[in-house]
A protein has these predicted regions:
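Bacterial Sec-dependent N-terminal signal peptides
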Residues: 1-25
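Alpha/beta-hydrolase-fold serine-hydrolase catalytic core, especially in secreted/extracellular enzymes
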Residues: 18-104, 273-383
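Cap/lid segment of the alpha/beta-hydrolase catalytic domain
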Residues: 115-192, 231-242, 247
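Loop/turn elements at helix/coil->beta-strand transitions in domains of secreted/extracellular proteins
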Residues: 118-120, 150-153, 197-200, 221-225, ...
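Alpha/beta-hydrolase fold nucleophile elbow
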Residues: 195-207
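Alpha/beta-hydrolase-fold catalytic nucleophile elbow
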Residues: 204, 229-230, 309
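Glycine-rich nucleophile elbow surrounding the catalytic serine of serine-hydrolase chemistry
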Residues: 205-217
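Mobile cap/lid helix-loop segments that gate and shape the active-site cleft of serine hydrolases
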Residues: 223-263, 268, 275-288, 294-300
Length: 383
């Protein structure tokens, strides 16, 4: 009976949306809020076996939809790490490595100054933003530096087309595939660093970085803790080609949404951060209960949490970061007391926000490698 209703509702969604979008692309507010809730009601499962069958289908369509059934050849070149800056309790270094032959990931590596026997590793994909762009923004620098001061090794890298990643435009047709490859290779890079505890690896990002967070976590079990911020929505599918520009949500009668994709994190610890000013406004009543049910199928309902800030907007602001710090400390065994004041509140004051020029990877002394493939057309051929 549920299958019948899924076919009916699928036909309704298609009729309602196909005139304005390609038939198998679900972009932006593809569903209405009511449709998003109805979809979750109809796809909710009552057994672990049923969910694992569904999750296998979802993972397969993500890979098929972004044409990533297999990863491209892994380059043999070594990562370049230089430009170390010693800060208050942490250091920052510039990083360049190939994610596939001819394409370079660019970013910054934040490390704690205090020596430890092993280190948690945290990936910090960033969201869309200008003046400055993603990894140079205050909220991103504070997030990365504070996590490093808590004892983690943190890597933040550029979205394609932003920062130092200027080999193609951000809105290139296969940006979703390229960014997913970059995310997986960033995980490879972080995991390869000396002292990284592979059982303490996490990912957290906001907006488009939230999309990168839950897609990476869905596809790669090496991510043990996930904190997608202001992105998981029953009705909103991501408004950029880097999130929804390839058919990962729909094929024929098959349909999913980002709530189901985020649910693939189960039973690993996950914190959903939501607010009242964007498409996550319904999280406590719609998205969170659905994901709780999935975790409950594993007997791990305690490992999924939601912090909802009804009076806040779409960002990774201080209160959202505060919630994330506590969650990361809990599950990655980080030292949150080392960054807290006498009242127990996280103090980001020691973090110095640097100018973009201080975090830039490429300059006259460190030019872009000569084998870098340039231009959308050339990058599309690589993909």
């Amino acid at each position: 009976m549920k299958t019948f209703f899924l076919l009916i509702i699928g036909a309704f969604f298609l009729a309602d949306n196909c005139c304005s979008q390609s038939a198998e692309l679900c972009q932006g507010a593809y569903f209405t809020e009511a449709q998003g809730k109805t979809f979750l009601d109809l796809t909710s499962v009552t057994s672990r076996g049923a969910w694992e069958a569904r999750s296998a289908t979802i993972k397969n369509q993500i890979r098929e939809g972004m044409q990533l059934q297999t990863m491209p050849a892994k380059p043999t070149s070594k990562p370049i790490i230089n430009g170390k800056r010693v800060m208050d309790g942490y250091s920052i270094e510039n990083v360049v490595f190939e994610s596939m032959p001819g394409f370079y990931v660019t970013g910054n590596l934040y490390r704690p100054l205090k020596k430890q026997r092993s280190y948690a590793g945290i990936l910090c994909p960033h969201g869309h933003g200008d003046n400055p762009e993603g990894r140079f923004r205050e909220q991103t620098q504070k997030r990365c530096a504070t996590l490093a001061r808590m004892g983690a090794v943190v890597f933040v890298w550029d979205m394609v087309g932003q920062g130092d990643s200027k080999q193609c435009e951000h809105k290139m047709a296969k940006a979703l595939k390229l960014q997913t490859i970059n995310s997986i290779r960033s995980l490879d890079f972080l995991s390869s660093l000396p002292g990284i505890d592979k059982n303490r690896i996490a990912a957290t990002g906001e907006s488009g970085g939230g999309t990168q967070t839950f897609i990476l976590t869905a596809l790669d079990d090496r991510v043990k803790v996930s904190v997608p911020a202001v992105m998981v929505s029953a009705y909103f599918f991501g408004g950029c080609v880097c999130e929804s520009g390839m058919p990962i949500h729909k094929k024929g009668d098959y349909q999913t949404n980002n709530v189901e994709i985020a649910s693939l994190t189960a039973p690993r610890p996950m914190l959903l951060i939501s607010d009242g000013g964007d498409w996550t406004k319904n999280t406590p009543k719609v998205e969170y209960p659905f994901i709780q049910n999935v975790y409950n199928l594993y007997g791990k309902k305690n490992l999924i949490e939601n912090v909802h800030l009804p009076d806040e907007k779409h960002d990774y602001g201080p209160s959202k970061r505060k919630a994330m710090y506590a969650f990361m400390a809990k599950y990655l065994k980080l030292d949150i007391k080392s960054v807290s004041d006498a009242s127990g509140n996280v103090d980001e004051g020691p973090v110095k926000v640097l100018d973009q020029k201080d975090l830039t990877v490429f300059d006259e002394q460190h030019p872009r490698p000569s084998n870098a493939v340039m231009g959308d057309e050339a990058i599309m051929k690589l993909l």
